[in-house]
């Protein structure tokens, strides 16, 4: 299916959106951007202990479905987030990010709502070593993954289907200022096993073979991450490898390789993301094909197994004039169920888009 999306109008309002930055850890430096508290009260900022940011984005969209030939239109709220963060001392810091347009019921595993992206505290032991704990964005590499959602018109299928705000602990070590190695242990899911997969869940890894899924005793995620910067920040990398415990003896392994060219008026990145799932974590393949159709007695809550996803993402920004930015983005993605002949390399999708942006 080919789907075209036209942004007839887009509105993005933020107080300190650039300072809010990305998803992982503190989301970037505040730089010289004022917090909303300063702007509203006109009080000079004396310290960095309390900063409040509101981020809002909405758009009017026209979509074309090439299969049916139908055009549809809508006006939609994309993002409405409140963020509070700060440095209580030169060593102790915190961050809260909460979405106003997501479910607020607490999940069974971590007791956080889906609406709460981040609620964490951290401690800098010194310039090289830090520890963060709480609910955070998992430290998968790649630049689309960590980009401020305010600036994403359409995510890749892979990132759009990832569930990555989890309770956990991150230990970060910087042997030199431009290089960081981080390790993370977090929950694999927000909810209990039965909440994620349903009662009596099964997996179909190959035709005719059904396995009952059992809850793992330690449903955790383990990630190793490298963030590198070279040539005074002109070339940056965000690479990661991790394994997630889906169920008993069922794991999801993921590799991410992100590279960025960062020039004064031109920025370009290229990401590769690959997922190798014993149990379909992204659930793209399982939503497009009924696993029960490939094995008898699979039950109502059946998922595909041995699923492999690839995602290639590239994006460029060019600030060709003051207050103006030209953005182009392309995506190519594949999906394959390796043990079911009919579903080997069954899915190839691509997307491309561009925008002309004005920042008053």
Report residues per predicted region.
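N-terminal periplasmic/intermembrane-space "pro-region" immediately following the signal or transit peptide
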Residues: 4-11, 18-59
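Solenoidal tandem-repeat scaffolds enriched in leucines and small polar residues
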Residues: 190-192, 198-201, 209-220, 228-230
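Outer-membrane beta-barrel translocator domains and adjoining extracellular loop/strand segments
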Residues: 64-71, 75, 104-115, 144-150, ...
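Hydrophobic, lipid-facing positions within transmembrane beta-strands of outer-membrane proteins
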Residues: 34, 38, 78-82, 116-121, ...
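Outer membrane beta-barrel
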Residues: 40-64, 69-191, 228-233
